[in-house]
Amino acid sequence: MAVDIQPACLGLYCGKTLLFKNGSSEIYGECGVCPRGQRTNAQKYCQPCTESPELYDWLYLGFMAMLPLVLHWFFIEWYSGKKSSSALFQHITALFECTMAAIITLLVSDPVGVLYIRSCRVLMLSDWYTMLYNPSPDYVTTVHCTHEAVYPLYTIVFVYYAFCLVLMMLLRPLLVKKIACGLGKSDRFKSIYAALYFFPILTVLQAVGGGLLYYAFPYIILVLSLVTLAVYMSASEIENCYDLLVRKKRLIVLFSHWLLHAYGIVSISRVDRLEHDLPLLALVPTPALFYLFTAKFTEPSRILSEGANGH
């Protein structure tokens, strides 16, 4: 195969785009930005992203997809009140919104119409921040080579959040207006108003810290799930197994946290060696068991009562 010989490209992410191919001859253009859906290879040629996402990539996308759902559930529970019968329907609606948004996002991504995506492999942290690596050969002129080297892991999250927001605005107000009769008029839509705040925050978080989240999300899941489980069990004054079993809601919260623990462990281990990594899942119930065994020494109910009395 004959390839035209040109000077090497400057910069970490500048590449040459294929202009013409005739049999065994390939003609490439000048160094510049690669088209969307391509990234540079070791020879500085722009190559299409044709690989399948790794398990870790899917786990990252799952984490980013879970964030709005968890926040929806939190604010629905926060504003619905203990006696509100609308909370369950809103929880189900939020799950439906996020699920449909994820499916639609996959369908509109390349290749269009299938629940499958093509991607470029993430090699290092700088792949997420190509705008920081535009070369300046003469220290005056900058060659702009910014492109999505981690295609589509960066932009697909924004598309998903957009569909989540659209579906929420189409479905949730009608549901809340119809069934949230136990709430005051000012409280009915507070969970929706909260979403209008946290979606922009999540968008900025992905835009600025997407690369950092990609490498840190397993540890974020483990730390937050451990902290929130301890806070919930303490606030609910759960000091033994009986306190845990008297209400179904407490069991649902416990199992949800166990799923998050397992998700974080699998993400950290990446299940590279299945027979060695699966036993790690036996650690999932350990934090809850440790709390129950040590609660009698700390007496969280006494601490809460003293805090409420201002002592």
Curated annotation (Swiss-Prot):
Listed name of the protein: JNK1/MAPK8-associated membrane protein
TM helices/strands, residue ranges: 58-78, 88-108, 150-170, 189-209, 211-231, 251-271, 278-298
Residues glycosylated per entry: N22
Main localization, broad class: endoplasmic reticulum
Stretches assigned to the Lumenal side: 1-57, 109-149, 210, 272-277
This protein's UniProt keywords: Endoplasmic reticulum, Glycoprotein, Membrane, Transmembrane, Transmembrane helix, Ubl conjugation, Unfolded protein response
Expression sites by tissue: Expressed in numerous tissues, including brain, spleen, thymus, liver, kidney and testis.
GO biological process, one term: response to unfolded protein
UniProt xrefs under InterPro entries: JAMP (IPR008485)
Purpose of the protein: Regulates the duration of MAPK8 activity in response to various stress stimuli. Facilitates degradation of misfolded endoplasmic reticulum (ER) proteins through the recruitment of components of the proteasome and endoplasmic reticulum-associated degradation (ERAD) system.
Segments in the Cytoplasmic topological domain: 79-87, 171-188, 232-250, 299-311
Subunit text: Interacts with RNF5 and MAPK8, but not with MAPK9. Binding to MAPK8 occurs before and after exposure to stress, such as UV irradiation. After exposure to stress, interacts with phosphorylated MAPK8. Competes with DUSP10 for MAPK8 binding. Associates with multiple components of the proteasome and with ERAD regulatory proteins, including AMFR/GP78, CANX, PSMC1, PSMC2, PSMC3/TBP1, PSMC5, PSMC6, PSMD8, SEC61-ALPHA and UFD1.
Entry's localization field: Endoplasmic reticulum membrane
Post-translational modification note: Ubiquitinated by RNF5 via 'Lys-63'-linked ubiquitin linkage in a UBE2N-dependent manner. Ubiquitination decreases association with components of the proteasome and ERAD.
UniProt effect for mutating S24A: Loss of glycosylation
Membrane topology according to the record: Multi-pass membrane protein
GO cellular component: endoplasmic reticulum membrane
